[in-house]
Amino acid sequence: MKTVNFTEMKAGTKDEYLLLDKYEQDYINGTADRILNFMQSLTSTLEGYKITRLEHSLQTATRAYRDKADEEMVVAALLHDIGDELAPLNHSEYAAAVIKPYVSEKTHWIIEKHGEFQMYYYAHHLGKNKNQRDKYKDLSLIHISEPTRPY
């Protein structure tokens, strides 16, 4: 593999940055495979549940599919908890950031906010506001635009 000669970014030449851009495009093209490989790590997270996070993710995607959601939403459902491993305190935002370049603004918003919506089922047991999601009740998702995809 060819490498650049510079050790400081300001010393890079056009040809070197063109080379790096090509490598970056190749790397970007492998993103889906890396994400699917990473999904395996969800088999060992969050003890105490009856199923693993991977099983939960597969169940969520299956439910979306059976509900006749579009392909984008099925994939988003599959990936909605990928942040649990590396960003447990903001897993929703992490997952949303990963999928943002590839999905509509609406789908991005749903993944980004799903952590707040799930609080409805448990937050009151922990002395927190279970109605956190209510702040969005007047929000209209109808006007959210479709994505300009990078691919």
Show the residue positions of the predicted features.
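Histidine-centered divalent metal-coordination motifs
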Residues: 80, 114, 143
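Amphipathic alpha-helical blocks and their helix-capping loop/short-beta junctions
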Residues: 122-141
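Secretory-pathway/luminal and periplasmic proteins that interact with or process carbohydrate-rich
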Residues: 84-88, 119-123
